[in-house]
Curated annotation (Swiss-Prot):
GO biological process entries: one-carbon metabolic process; tetrahydrobiopterin biosynthetic process; tetrahydrofolate biosynthetic process
GO molecular function: GTP binding; GTP cyclohydrolase I activity; zinc ion binding
Listed GO CC annotations: cytoplasm
Protein name: GTP cyclohydrolase 1
Similarity-based family: Belongs to the GTP cyclohydrolase I family.
Species: Haemophilus influenzae (strain PittEE)
Disulphide bridges: none
InterPro entries, per database record: GTP-CH-I_C/QueF, GTP-CH-I_N, GTP_CycHdrlase_I, GTP_CycHdrlase_I_CS, GTP_CycHdrlase_I_dom
Record-listed Zn(2+) binding positions: C109, H112, C180
UniProt keyword GTP-binding present: yes
Subunit and interaction comment: Toroid-shaped homodecamer, composed of two pentamers of five dimers.
SUPFAM superfamilies: Tetrahydrobiopterin biosynthesis enzymes-like
Metabolic or biological pathway: Cofactor biosynthesis; 7,8-dihydroneopterin triphosphate biosynthesis; 7,8-dihydroneopterin triphosphate from GTP: step 1/1
Length: 218
């Protein structure tokens, strides 16, 4: 079993404490066993849909799906995959806003298991620590790689960054298209969903929040 880092444990505990952790159970089977079991079930699902799995285009699809679920699009359910964090002491006394815009978001709607596609913007005011800019992208990707609802994802990101950076002064903005709306049901291809979460100065000071939103809404 892979070791879970202290940062990952702290983030998970913070999410649980706030009641915003993804509803998950700890698997009792090894990954290989889970892949095998998922493939068998997907084989039956595809047969029930009416697909002929003897066709060479379809025969490996159950195995592909099993690998995709465990190793790729739902890999963020395993905190052993949480990005390795190297926190840097804020020796330069950086006090201005650090902001990363247009982070690619590709997640999966937990209601219909179809794609959520969008962008994430994250900002924070450093206190004692800063992190490499790419770590912000990696944390977004980690929480995207699990069945999600956008509202909870936004709150999870806020809490994760607050926990790692040891500051409340964090803002998260998410703009996404949901394929459960675009590809089924109403089939609206134009609409998108916006969610945001604020802590510390972003929550308390309107001008700071406006400064953040002025750049993400361009």
């Amino acid at each position: 079993m892979s070791k879970i880092s202290l940062d990952a444990l702290n983030v998970r505990n913070a999410l649980i404490e706030k009641g915003i952790e993804t509803p998950m159970i700890d698997p009792t089977q090894a990954k290989d066993e889970r892949r095998e079991s998922i493939a068998k079930h997907m084989h039956e699902v595809m047969k029930l849909i009416g697909l002929d799995l003897r066709d060479d285009s379809l025969e490996e699809t159950p195995n592909r799906l099993a690998k995709m679920f465990i190793d790729e699009i739902f890999s963020g359910m395993d905190y052993a995959n949480f990005p390795k964090m190297t926190k840097i002491k804020n020796q330069m006394k950086v006090s201005e806003m650090v902001q990363v815009n247009d982070i690619t978001l590709t997640s999966t709607c937990e209601h219909h298991f179809v794609t959520i596609d969008g962008k994430v913007c994250v900002a924070y005011y450093p206190k004692d620590w800063v992190i490499g800019l790419s770590k912000i992208n990696r944390i977004v990707s980690f929480f995207a790689q699990r069945p999600q609802v956008q509202e909870r994802l936004t709150e999870q990101l806020l809490t994760a960054f607050q926990t790692i950076l040891e500051t409340d002064d964090v803002a998260v903005y998410v703009k996404a298209t949901h394929f459960c709306v675009k590809a089924r049901g109403i089939r609206d291809t134009n609409s998108y969903t916006v969610t945001s979460a604020y802590g510390g100065v972003f929550l308390e000071d309107r001008d700071t929040r406006k400064e953040f939103l002025a750049t993400v809404q361009k």
